[in-house]
Amino acid sequence: MSVFTPLERSTLEAFLAPYDLGRLRDFRGIAEGSENSNFFVSLEHGEFVLTLVERGPVQDLPFFIELLDVLHEDGLPVPYALRTRDGEALRRLEGKPALLQPRLAGRHERQPNAHHCQEVGDLLGHLHAATRGRILERPSDRGLPWMLEQGANLAPRLPEQARALLAPALAEIAALDAERPALPRANLHADLFRDNVLFDGPHLAGLIDFYNACSGWMLYDLAITLNDWCSNTDGSLDPARARALLAAYANRRPFTALEAEHWPSMLRVACVRFWLSRLIAAEAFAGQDVLIHDPAEFEIRLAQRQNVEIHLPFAL
């Protein structure tokens, strides 16, 4: 189970008292998280999620709180930070920054179809449209420079076939980092995977886990999303799902010619980002009772993205 900081009931009760949400009925750790400690918390006046932030600089947390407030006010189904009776949103518990948020209804869709992908494309387009006019600036702590540094560190320990796949991808990232093309920007979720979306029946009911959110190219966020939601088990893209997601997104925000040009490379960049972070996590948490996602999943996807046949609607 991915709970890095266990909690005693009495400690949690004292923490929850200032929210005036009634007595604590029950709480349990959430196994799905891989970076923070998350708990389902059942109180007299509702169901909530408590997050203890285990990774990242504390100074970034006000950014996440403000971004979620902006998205909530624009009608997106996101978990915003609740305030105590004194107006505090960001607090500390067991020495860690802590946030209490409403628990959203729904479940994760492990085997999405074209309808689910259409809903996700519309959601991502809404998120970008809500923030592109007034971007809350925060560079990603796992952006292009991070990929170049970590890729160089990890490459010597990889098998020859993996190194041969990674090397040209890192060269492509270096070129992109040097060019910094003028692609349209907004705030990004930057981790919009299946386990961060909730469906209530056929309807998308929630988008969670914003702790990788940042500002940047919208195309990169779209590539991250499509790589997870529209990939087959062999790493290839499913055309029906991919086109449904892209069409729904484009209804919210049309693509530019420059985005169409950079689309294939952005899909590869998005693969590298998660291949590297999963390799790092697999080394760091080896032998521990922590959820570790398989790095090979993105190695396979990167291999499949050497030829991209699913183009943006602009380029059809």
UniProtKB/Swiss-Prot annotation:
GO molecular function: ATP binding; homoserine kinase activity
Keyword Kinase in record: yes
Listed EC numbers: 2.7.1.39
Protein family per UniProt: Belongs to the pseudomonas-type ThrB family.
Gene Ontology biological-process annotations: threonine biosynthetic process
Protein's recorded name: Homoserine kinase
InterPro entries: Aminoglycoside_PTrfase, Homoserine_kinase_II, Kinase-like_dom_sf, Pseudomonas-type_ThrB
Reactions catalysed: L-homoserine + ATP = O-phospho-L-homoserine + ADP + H(+)
PANTHER family the record matches: AMINOGLYCOSIDE PHOSPHOTRANSFERASE DOMAIN-CONTAINING PROTEIN, AMINOGLYCOSIDE PHOSPHOTRANSFERASE DOMAIN-CONTAINING PROTEIN-RELATED
Pathway as given in its UniProt record: Amino-acid biosynthesis; L-threonine biosynthesis; L-threonine from L-aspartate: step 4/5
Keywords assigned: Amino-acid biosynthesis, ATP-binding, Kinase, Nucleotide-binding, Threonine biosynthesis, Transferase
Disruption phenotype: Cells lacking thrB are still able to grow in a minimal medium without the addition of threonine.
